[in-house]
């Protein structure tokens, strides 16, 4: 992704340009809500920005390092629900990916906490599954086109 090109859409699926969406958070501005932090973290996974992921992970649950070299090719994000109550937040999402010739998804119910005016990812309950899109199904890459005229050809 060419982050210097202001017309590039943000990987989080907001339909905004990256420069107006997740980039300010990646550059250190605090996320405004749990959903905003989750979207920015998804974008960081797409961009393999381990530094940002670690910085936005709560100290109580943060791993000492994060290796993203073998990460799948993340293709789209679907936010199912998001809520905020005081200093706690929850986001339920599904992230789709391509791994080799197949497709899969990661679904998570994430918990967030606000400390010192910043939201942090705390933990999540995850499940994964395989996708077998039909030719006339929506493409899991998030393009909005049918699978047969999009990624099936690749």
Label every model-predicted segment.
Residues 3-16, 135-144:
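Short Cys/His-rich zinc-binding micro-motifs
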Residues 55, 59, 90-92, 103, ...:
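Long C-terminal interaction/binding lobes of large macromolecular proteins
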Residues 70-105:
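Surface-exposed, charged secondary-structure patches
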Residues 107-133, 149:
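Short beta-strand edge/turn micro-motifs at domain boundaries
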Residues 154:
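Sequence context surrounding c-type heme c attachment/ligation sites in exported
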């Amino acid at each position: 992704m060419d982050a210097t090109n202001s017309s590039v859409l943000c990987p989080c699926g907001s339909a905004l340009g990256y420069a107006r969406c997740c980039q300010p958070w990646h550059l250190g501005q605090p996320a405004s809500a749990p959903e905003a932090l989750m979207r920015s973290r998804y974008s960081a996974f797409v961009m393999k920005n381990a530094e940002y992921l670690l910085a936005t992970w709560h100290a109580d649950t943060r791993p000492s390092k994060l290796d993203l070299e073998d990460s799948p090719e993340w293709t789209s994000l679907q936010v199912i629900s998001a809520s905020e109550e005081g200093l706690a937040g929850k986001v339920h999402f599904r992230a789709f990916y391509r791994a080799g010739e197949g497709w899969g998804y990661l679904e998570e119910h994430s918990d967030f906490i606000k400390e010192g005016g910043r939201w942090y990812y705390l933990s999540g309950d995850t499940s994964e599954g395989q996708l077998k899109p039909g030719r006339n199904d929506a493409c899991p890459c998030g393009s909005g086109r049918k699978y047969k005229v999009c990624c099936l050809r690749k």
